[in-house]
Regions:
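Aromatic-rich, lipid-facing transmembrane alpha helices and their immediate juxtamembrane interface loops
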Residues: 1-265
Length: 265
């Protein structure tokens, strides 16, 4: 299976379906609830596409340059930017669109009811930041000591966890408040893309270096690190879009700006 064939079948087609569903929802007047409409959906989606492209490009080029993964030259067009084929850059754009449209689809179906009581929880934010930061330090230690089988995992977590830490520090309690929506946004796209990745690896479209990975295969095909890649990238996307669109995040940032202004006055 060529790389562009993979993109067409597993990303372009479901994106087209989600766009059609988005258009149908608009025609029927189905919208996001007010709590999740603090910013335009298209702006949040575009922002994440741009950030994903910029943030992933140097990291993925390093992976290919150091042989963590590579691709079958006969299954790509041959157009490359740096070390990475143009198809991979296309994936950088399509995955955020796919996951973002999926999340927005369920946002439009979210009932908008909130549990009563106080939802702000600084302790939750602090605990989660400490836990994830500890994971980042462990991943960094793997790279520092040069444990070769942990290379892919270490590079993956040291790259992905810092922005997740930032998201949790800002509003982990907001994400917890919308936890059902967040889980719905993360789990199905992760499982779907992992299954598609298994087919691509099985057909030889790209290869993961067994010497630089843990060699723990899900279903005998998919390296654990590949599953984790889709998990952490979808976490980044869903966390980010939820926080941008949630009214609570906007209110918190505004309150902190007012406090900073009052302190500085």
């Amino acid at each position: 299976m060529s790389y562009f064939s993979f993109l067409g079948v597993f990303l372009v087609i479901p994106i087209a379906i989600l766009l059609w569903l988005t258009r149908r929802d608009r025609q029927r007047g189905r919208q996001r609830p007010a709590q999740l409409a603090s910013s335009p959906a298209w702006l949040a989606l575009l922002l994440h596409v741009v950030i994903a492209f910029i943030y992933t490009t140097p990291w993925d080029n390093y992976l290919v340059a150091t042989g963590v993964w590579w691709y079958d030259a006969n299954l790509v067009t041959g157009l490359t930017l740096g070390w990475v084929p143009i198809e991979e850059y296309t994936f950088f754009v399509l995955q955020p669109i796919l996951t973002g449209l999926w999340l927005l689809f369920w946002m439009r179906r979210w009932p908008g009811r909130q549990p009563a009581g106080e939802w702000q929880n600084g302790r939750l934010r602090a605990i989660l930041v400490v836990v994830v930061a500890a994971g980042w330090l462990i991943a960094l230690a793997i790279l520092v000591i040069g444990w070769r089988p942990g290379t892919y995992l270490g590079l993956q977590l040291t790259w992905a966890l810092p922005p997740i830490i930032l998201q949790l520090a800002v509003a982990a309690d907001v994400l917890w408040r919308y936890r059902r929506l967040v889980v719905t946004g993360i789990v199905p796209p992760t499982l779907y893309l992992a299954a598609a990745d298994s087919l691509a690896i099985g057909s030889g479209t790209w290869i993961i270096d067994p010497q630089q990975s843990l060699n723990l295969l899900i279903g005998g095909v998919l390296p654990l690190e590949e599953f984790l890649f889709f998990l952490v990238t979808n976490v980044l996307l869903v966390f980010g879009m939820t926080l941008i669109l949630a009214r609570e995040t906007k209110s918190r940032i505004a309150a902190r700006r007012i406090l900073a202004w009052e302190i500085g006055d």
